[in-house]
């Protein structure tokens, strides 16, 4: 047989099969055609014909035959090396498929508003990365209107927030999680803290405020709270939708802002801020997990969603077991509509 140059896709013309690759490896391990054929549950004549037909098609001899068995030559050694690589890759592909089907690998993109990011998403991601180390997780913190649009576009698999009024809620599946308790925060040592008593809206109205843009849920809640106490909304307002910027500004001057209590409780022990003692507790309407109804989630996304839904169920059960406030003045809920909710 005369060697020749192998063209692109030579393996198609040679009709190279998976069985050929298995035979190369078996011959390398056994160096005997009979034993190699037996390991593949083939007859020796069938194995001999399979090898001979391929050598004829390739135009090169791969194995030297002798009385004691067979030995791969230089060409055969090359084919054995690549056969092992291909078979190993196929085995790994099967293992990865199993992991993907089980939700152990793949990727998931999660969106969330700030409060559940701290008290729900972070603990769940910690568990997911421990139990599914090959699962790639991306998390983004945004306002609810941005999250709803990104889930609708398929940029995110699911999100935790509130479905804005201008969004068609029928497109989404939604699981309510919890209402979001709010609080006012300022820097440690703020002059208002020297009053030594729970503060009212009247005490806070003249402060400099760091608030979300007009129309946002938290901004609307603060304004409604002030009006309910017969006080005009804050006038000296610096607008910022970024909790990081709000926190940095509060730490540097005598401004006041509004945070989810869960978030404030994370930052206050660090000295970044302190919770303002207010004379009543107040919150905003519940947030939940939402995802598109008609778009199937990947196995990895289903794994993450199931973990978050389980964690939210636990959170709701604990909330129901807690003692309820004695009157409506203890916790006020603002259910006013807002076009741009945070």
From Swiss-Prot:
Source organism, top-level taxon: Bacteria
Stretches of the chain forming a coiled coil according to its record: none
Pfam (any one): HTH_1
UniProt keyword annotation of Mitochondrion present: no
The entry's DNA-binding region: 33-52
Keywords, alphabetical: DNA-binding, Transcription, Transcription regulation
InterPro entries: GbpR_PBP2, HTH-type_LysR_regulators, LysR_subst-bd, Tscrpt_reg_HTH_LysR, WH-like_DNA-bd_sf, WH_DNA-bd_sf
Keyword DNA-binding assigned: yes
GO cellular component: cytosol
Residues in HTH lysR-type domain copies: 16-73
Entry's Gene Ontology molecular function annotations: DNA binding; DNA-binding transcription factor activity
Membership in a protein family: Belongs to the LysR transcriptional regulatory family.
Entry function: Does not seem to be required for sbpA expression.
The protein, known as: HTH-type transcriptional regulator GbpR
Lineage, highest ranks first: Bacteria, Pseudomonadati, Pseudomonadota, Alphaproteobacteria, Rhodospirillales
Gene name of the encoded protein: gbpR
């Amino acid at each position: 047989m005369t060697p020749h140059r192998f063209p692109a896709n030579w393996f198609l013309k040679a009709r190279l099969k998976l069985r050929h690759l298995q035979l190369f490896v078996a011959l390398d391990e056994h160096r005997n055609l009979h034993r190699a054929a037996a390991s593949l549950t083939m007859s020796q004549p069938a194995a001999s014909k399979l090898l001979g037909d391929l050598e004829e098609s390739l135009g090169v001899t791969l194995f030297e035959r002798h009385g004691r068995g067979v030995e791969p030559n230089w060409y055969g050694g090359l084919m054995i090396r690549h056969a092992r690589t291909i078979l190993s890759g196929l085995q790994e592909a099967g293992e990865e498929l199993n992991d993907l089907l089980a939700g152990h690998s793949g990727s998931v993109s999660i969106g969330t508003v700030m409060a559940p990011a701290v008290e729900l998403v972070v603990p769940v991601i910690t568990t997911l990365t421990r139990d599914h180390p090959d699962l790639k997780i991306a998390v983004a913190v945004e306002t609810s209107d941005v999250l709803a649009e990104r889930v609708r576009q398929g940029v995110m698999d699911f999100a935790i927030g509130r479905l804005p009024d201008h969004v068609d809620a029928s497109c989404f599946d939604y699981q309510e999680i919890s209402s979001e308790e709010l609080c006012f925060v300022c820097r440690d040592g703020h002059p208002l803290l020297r009053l030594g008593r729970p503060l009212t809206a009247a005490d806070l109205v003249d402060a400099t405020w760091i608030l979300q843009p007009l129309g946002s849920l938290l901004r609307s809640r603060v304004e409604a709270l002030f009006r309910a106490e017969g006080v005009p909304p804050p006038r000296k307002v610096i607008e910022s939708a970024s909790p990081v910027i709000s926190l940095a500004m509060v730490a540097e001057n005598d401004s006041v802002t509004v945070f989810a209590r869960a978030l404030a409780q994370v930052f206050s022990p660090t000295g970044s801020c302190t919770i303002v003692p207010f004379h009543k507790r107040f919150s905003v309407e519940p947030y939940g997990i939402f995802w598109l109804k008609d778009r199937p989630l990947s196995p990895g996304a289903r794994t993450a969603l199931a973990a978050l839904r389980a964690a939210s169920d636990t959170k709701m059960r604990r909330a129901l077991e807690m003692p309820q406030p004695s009157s409506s003045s203890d916790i006020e809920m603002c259910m006013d509509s807002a076009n741009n909710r945070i």
